[in-house]
Design a protein with these regions (language model features):
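Active-site acidic/histidine clusters and adjacent loop/turn architecture
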Residues: 63, 82-91, 97, 101-114
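A short glycine-rich, hydrophobically flanked beta-strand micro-motif that places a catalytic Asp/Glu
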Residues: 130-143, 217-228
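Helical (often loop-to-helix) elements that flank the catalytic cores of nucleotide-handling enzymes
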Residues: 152-176
């Protein structure tokens, strides 16, 4: 257990009313587990998450608002702890898990993973009780203009267990790292299990370079999960081809407000 993170959570939930109220509301959230084609889906009715799910992420809206992850724009009550030389760890005031963190870069730089994946692995080591996740700029990130990771406590995502049970085709093995394709339709999940940081990065870069980039985008559309399991790194990569489903913009009875970030996948 990372005592610095636990202390931050405790202090923020006792002193910051917004976070305090939303974490209390999370305990009243309705949850239902259903299985579809053998895959477990955890349905959560969490009205407080509308702030993120309905966030406007078009270029015009982003340019017109102050970046809520820049240090100068944080609420006065929001405190953080440093991580490495470029990040700070914050309590997410709109939680989806019992312990939910946001880890933004101190500088205002775009949401891009390729040259920051190493930092993501380091964060998984530092916050060993957490799963680290990255949402691409057009894959659920509510701040696509500011580099950040998020973290949720282990045990709240079904993929943790399914990553062990649903390994299908072994794609490639390189030294102490293996790339698997999971049998978890309708998702398309690639899983890397690596015994060293170097081989995890090598296989991730291989997958990244093989993925197609959408026209006009600098980065292939993807969501990424990382956590430590004993001495190994587990990396789940979820390729994407669309930001929001057609039902998001549909009208009338066909409208369903679903905005898929990694947590929802």
């Amino acid at each position: 257990m990372n005592k610095e993170i636990e202390t931050l959570l405790s202090e923020q939930l006792s002193s910051w009313e917004t976070a305090q109220n939303n974490y209390a509301a999370l305990k009243r959230v309705r949850i239902k587990d259903v299985k579809v084609n053998g895959c477990l889906y955890r349905i959560q009715f969490n009205p407080a998450r509308i702030v993120s799910s309905a966030a406007k992420v078009d270029s015009k809206s982003i340019q017109e608002r102050k970046c809520f992850l820049c240090p100068a724009n944080l609420p006065p009550m929001q405190k953080g702890i440093p991580f490495g030389e470029h990040y700070q760890i914050l309590v997410n005031p709109f939680p989806i898990s019992p312990k939910h963190l946001t880890v933004p870069e101190l500088q205002h730089v775009e949401q891009r993973i390729l040259h920051r994946f190493s930092d993501m692995l380091d964060l998984a080591t530092y916050a060993e009780d957490y799963i680290i996740f990255y949402n691409g700029p057009q894959c659920g990130a509510s701040a696509p203009d500011h580099l950040h990771f998020q973290a949720g406590n282990k045990g709240f995502l079904p993929i943790e267990q399914e990553s062990k049970e649903k390994r299908g085709e072994k794609v490639i093995t390189c030294k102490d790292a293996t790339l698997w394709a999971l049998n978890d339709y309708p998702r398309a999940t690639l899983l890397i299990e690596a015994g060293s940081k170097e081989t995890a990065i090598m296989l991730f870069n291989t997958v990244y370079q093989a993925m197609p980039s959408t026209s006009g985008e600098d980065e292939p559309m993807m969501n990424v999960l990382v956590w430590k399991e004993q001495k190994n790194w587990i990396v789940c990569i979820f390729p994407r081809n669309k930001h929001r489903p057609s039902c998001y913009t549909a009208e009338g009875d066909t409208n369903i407000l679903i905005s898929l970030s990694l947590i929802h996948i």
